[in-house]
Curated annotation (Swiss-Prot):
This is Proprotein convertase subtilisin/kexin type 9. InterPro entries: PCSK9_C1 (IPR041254), PCSK9_C2 (IPR041052), PCSK9_C3 (IPR041051), PCSK9_ProteinaseK-like (IPR034193), Peptidase_S8/S53_dom (IPR000209), Peptidase_S8/S53_dom_sf (IPR036852), Peptidase_S8_subtilisin-like (IPR050131), Peptidase_S8_subtilisin-rel (IPR015500). The gene is Pcsk9. GO terms for biological process: apoptotic process; cellular response to insulin stimulus; cellular response to starvation; cholesterol homeostasis; cholesterol metabolic process; kidney development; lipoprotein metabolic process; liver development. The modification Phosphoserine is found at residues 50, 691. It comes from the Eukaryota. The keyword Disulfide bond applies. A motif (Cell attachment site) lies at residues 499-501. It is found in: Cytoplasm; Secreted; Endosome; Lysosome. Disulfide bonds join 226-258, 326-361, 460-530, 480-529, 489-512, 537-604, 555-603, 565-591, 611-682, 629-681, 638-657. Residues 453-694 are annotated as: C-terminal domain.
C-alpha cells in the first residue's frame, strides 16, 4: 500500500517557518494519507496564498490543487510530473501555464523541461523538474492536480479458444453488413515482430515510441526479447491460427521497454496518439488493448474515460498481483472492460506467490494460463505465456468480433452482453480473500451470439460501490454507465449495522446511495444497472409514517411498473429496525416499509416492459436466502422482507437475489420471523404494453 503523505498548513504560520522546514513539511514521506473512492495513492493538499513574483493578480490566489503519487514507492518516478489542468482550460492557456512555470522556475535558478503538452485527451503537460518546484507549480492558475509519474508493467507471466468460442462459432467469419471487417485494435505494449506468419500483413507498426530506459547498464536488448510480449498478444488477438479475431487489423504502439516496463506518462501519450489518429482520419470501431498495470492513477483513469466517451472500447488487464484490482490503473477505471485470468479448469490463475487480481473492478475473467501464441524467436515459432494480459487479449478479440458483426454496438451494450452470455458459477470463489468473494464476478468470457439471436433479452448487471468509511454518517455511492438505467438500489454491511439505501440525482444522473450506522464497520451500495431501450424512469418516495403504520409508496404514472424498492432509516436504534416489504398479494406494485423508514420506489415505462415479484423465505437458521427469476426474466430489484432477524443486506448475483442473515444461530424462530428474499423480475416484450404481473 505504501507510505502516505499529507499536509495541510495554515498560511498565517508560514512566515514563522524556515524555508527548508516548510519544504520538508510539504513533501513529507510519512503521515496521514488520503484515499480516493476507487484507488490508493498519496495526496498533498495545499492551501497557501500565492506570493510569486509580487504580481497583484496573484497575491490573493490560494492554491487548492493536490499532489498525488503512486502508493507503491518502488514504482515512483520522482522528477517527472503530469500537470493536469482544469477541464475547461483552453489550448492557449495550457501553453501559457507551461511557459509561466518555466519562467518562474528560471528566476529561482532551476531549469525545467516540458516533455509533452496534452491537448486532445485532457488539458495538461508532462514536465521534468525538481521536486523543489512542486509548491510553485501547484499555485499556478488552471492547475487541478499534479501527479508524479510512475511505472506500469506488462501483465504476463490451445484450450483457450475452445473455452471462449463455442464450436458453432469456430469456423464463422465476422464481417460487418457490407462484407468487410472494419474494426481496428490498438495494442499498447512492447515492440512487435511484424514478420511473424501469425500476424504478417495484419499489423501496422506505428512510429510511436515512448518508453523508459531499461534497468541495468549491462542489459542486452535482444530483439526477440524486446518483441516477446507484444508479438504474443498480437497473435492472441488476430493470429491466423491461434487468434480469437482472425484477420482483425492491429496497430502497435510501443509503451513498454524490453523489460516489459513503461510509465503512466508514456501510456497517456500513447492514448493521445490514438485520439489524434481518430481526429485526423476517422475510421470504423476502435478497440484499445491495455495489457499493463501500474499503481492507481487518477489521470490515467480520467484519460480512459475521455477516450471511451469518443466511442473507443478499452480492454485492460486486471493485474497479476493477487490483489484488489481497484488499487491499480487502468484496471480501476469504470469505463474500461477489466479482465481477470483463469486456467483450463476455469479457476483463478496462480503465478508463483501471486496470481490474477480480483474484486468489484473486474468485469469478468478469461483464459490466461499457458496460452499458445506467436513467439518472437522466429517467424514461425510459437510459445506459451500466462497472465491477465493474455486474458485481456482474449476479450479484446471477442469485442473485435462482436463489433465486426454489429459496428454500432456501444461500450455499455458490449459489456452487458459479455456479462450476460458468459459462463457462470464455475470459478471456485474460495481462492479469493473472504472479503472479496461477494464482490468478485463468477464469470468466464465466451463469444456472445448476435443481436437477432438474443431475442430482445433485458440485460442487467450489478455494480458495487467502494466500501464506505466506518463513521455513522459515512455513505457509499454506486453509479451506472450513462447509457444504463438504474432500476434498483440495495445495500450490504458485513456487521449488519446500516441505515439503508436510496436513489438520488447527482449531476443529472441517478445514483445508488447507502448509509452506514453508528457502530458499523462500513457499508456497500449495490446498483442494478440495465439497458432498457426508450425507457422513462423515475423515483417516488414517501417519508417515514411514524404513526404505528407501515410506509407505502407506489408508481404514480400510468403504465409505469415497479422495478425496485429501497429504504432509508430515520432512526439509529437498530433494535426496532425492519426491512421494507414488497407486498405482492394484497398490494401489488407497491413498496411497503417500516414506520421509521423512508421508502423509495423505482418505476419505469418502456415498450413491452412487464415485471413481477418473486419471494422465498426460510424460518430456520441460514446464512442466506435466495430467490431466482425464471428463464426469460431478468432480475431488476432485490431486497428482503420484514423479519425479526437482523440482516446484513441484499444484493443481486446475475439473476439471483441474495439476502444475507446475521443471527443464523437462532433455531427457535417462528414462521413469522422468517427471512424472506424478494426479487423483482422483468422482461421486455416490445409488442406488448408495460404491465405489472400478479
Amino acid at each position: 500500500m505504501g507510505t502516505h503523505c499529507s499536509a495541510w498548513l495554515r498560511w498565517p504560520l508560514l512566515p514563522l517557518l524556515p524555508p527548508l522546514l516548510l519544504l520538508l513539511l510539504l513533501l513529507c514521506p510519512t503521515g496521514a494519507g488520503a484515499q480516493d473512492e476507487d484507488g490508493d495513492y498519496e495526496e498533498l493538499m495545499l492551501a497557501l496564498p500565492s506570493q510569486e513574483d509580487g504580481l497583484a493578480d496573484e497575491a490573493a490566489h490560494v492554491a487548492t490543487a493536490t499532489f498525488r503519487r503512486c502508493s507503491k514507492e518502488a514504482w515512483r518516478l520522482p522528477g517527472t510530473y503530469i500537470v493536469v489542468l482544469m477541464e475547461e482550460t483552453q489550448r492557449l492557456q495550457i501553453e501559457q501555464t507551461a511557459h509561466r512555470l518555466q519562467t518562474r522556475a528560471a528566476r529561482r535558478g532551476y531549469v525545467i523541461k516540458v516533455l509533452h503538452i496534452f491537448y486532445d485527451l485532457f488539458p495538461g503537460f508532462l514536465v521534468k523538474m525538481s521536486s523543489d518546484l512542486l509548491g510553485l507549480a501547484l499555485k499556478l492558475p488552471h492547475v487541478e492536480y499534479i501527479e508524479e509519474d510512475s511505472f506500469v508493467f506488462a501483465q504476463s507471466i490451445p484450450w483457450n479458444l475452445e473455452r471462449i468460442i463455442p464450436a458453432w462459432h469456430q469456423t464463422e467469419e465476422d464481417r460487418s453488413p457490407d462484407g468487410s471487417s472494419q474494426v481496428e485494435v490498438y495494442l499498447l505494449d512492447t515492440s512487435i515482430q511484424g514478420a511473424h506468419r501469425e500476424i504478417e500483413g495484419r499489423v501496422t507498426i506505428t512510429d510511436f515510441n515512448s518508453v523508459p530506459e531499461e534497468d541495468g547498464t549491462r542489459f542486452h536488448r535482444q530483439a526477440s526479447k524486446c518483441d516477446s510480449h507484444g508479438t504474443h498478444l498480437a497473435g492472441v488477438v488476430s493470429g491466423r491460427d491461434a487468434g480469437v479475431a482472425k484477420g482483425t487489423s492491429l496497430h502497435s504502439l510501443r509503451v513498454l521497454n524490453c523489460q516489459g516496463k513503461g510509465t503512466v506518462s508514456g501510456t497517456l501519450i500513447g492514448l493521445e496518439f490514438i485520439r489524434k489518429s481518430q481526429l485526423i482520419q476517422p475510421s470504423g470501431p476502435l478497440v484499445v488493448l491495455l495489457p499493463l498495470a501500474g499503481g492507481y492513477s487518477r489521470i490515467l483513469n480520467a484519460a480512459c474515460r475521455h477516450l471511451a466517451r469518443t466511442g473507443v472500447v478499452l480492454v485492460a488487464a486486471a493485474g497479476n498481483f493477487r490483489d484488489d484490482a481497484c488499487l491499480y490503473s487502468p484496471a480501476s477505471a469504470p469505463e474500461v472492460i477489466t479482465v481477470g485470468a483463469t486456467n483450463a479448469q476455469d479457476q483463478p490463475v496462480t503465478l508463483g506467490t501471486l496470481g490474477t487480481n480480483f474484486g468489484r473492478c473486474v468485469d469478468l475473467f478469461a483464459p490466461g494460463k499457458d496460452i499458445i501464441g506467436a513467439s518472437s524467436d522466429c517467424s514461425t515459432c510459437f510459445m506459451s505465456q500466462s497472465g491477465t494480459s493474455q486474458a485481456a487479449a482474449h476479450v479484446a478479440g471477442i469485442v473485435a468480433r462482436m463489433l465486426s458483426r454489429e459496428p454500432t454496438l456501444t461500450l455499455a451494450e458490449l459489456r452487458q452482453r459479455l456479462i450476460h452470455f458468459s459462463t457462470k458459477d464455475v470459478i471456485n470463489m474460495a481462492w479469493f480473500p473472504e472479503d472479496q468473494q461477494v464482490l468478485t464476478p463468477n464469470l468466464v468470457a465466451t463469444l456472445p451470439p448476435s443481436t437477432h439471436e438474443t431475442g430482445g433479452q433485458l440485460l442487467c448487471r450489478t455494480v458495487w460501490s467502494a466500501h464506505s468509511g466506518p463513521t455513522r454518517t459515512a455513505t457509499a455511492t454506486a453509479r451506472c454507465a450513462p447509457e444504463e438505467e438504474l432500476l434498483s438500489c440495495s445495500s450490504f454491511s458485513r456487521s449488519g449495522r446500516r441505515r439503508g439505501d436510496w436513489i438520488e440525482a447527482i449531476g443529472g444522473q441517478q445514483v445508488c446511495k447507502a448509509l452506514n450506522a453508528f457502530g458499523g464497520e462500513g457499508v456497500y451500495a449495490v446498483a442494478r444497472c440495465c439497458l432498457v431501450p426508450r425507457a422513462n424512469c423515475s423515483i417516488h418516495n414517501t417519508p417515514a409514517a411514524r404513526a404505528g403504520l407501515e410506509t407505502h409508496v407506489h408508481c404514480h404514472q400510468k403504465d409505469h411498473v415497479l422495478t425496485g424498492c429501497s429504504f432509508h432509516w430515520e432512526v439509529e436504534d437498530l433494535s426496532v429496525r425492519r426491512q421494507p416489504a414488497l407486498r405482492s398479494r394484497r398490494q401489488p406494485g407497491q413498496c411497503v416499509g417500516h414506520q421509521a423508514a423512508s421508502v423509495y420506489a423505482s418505476c419505469c415505462h418502456a415498450p413491452g416492459l412487464e415485471c413481477k415479484i418473486k419471494e422465498h423465505g426460510i424460518s430456520g437458521p441460514s446464512e442466506q436466502v435466495t430467490v431466482a427469476c425464471e428463464a426469460g426474466w431478468t432480475l431488476t430489484g432485490c431486497n428482503v422482507l420484514p423479519g425479526a432477524s437482523l440482516t446484513l443486506g441484499a444484493y443481486s448475483v446475475d439473476n439471483l437475489c441474495v439476502a444475507r442473515v446475521h443471527d443464523t444461530a437462532r433455531a427457535d424462530r417462528t414462521s413469522g420471523e422468517a427471512t424472506v428474499a424478494a426479487a423483482i423480475c422483468c422482461r421486455s416484450r416490445p409488442s406488448a404494453k408495460a404491465s405489472w404481473v400478479q
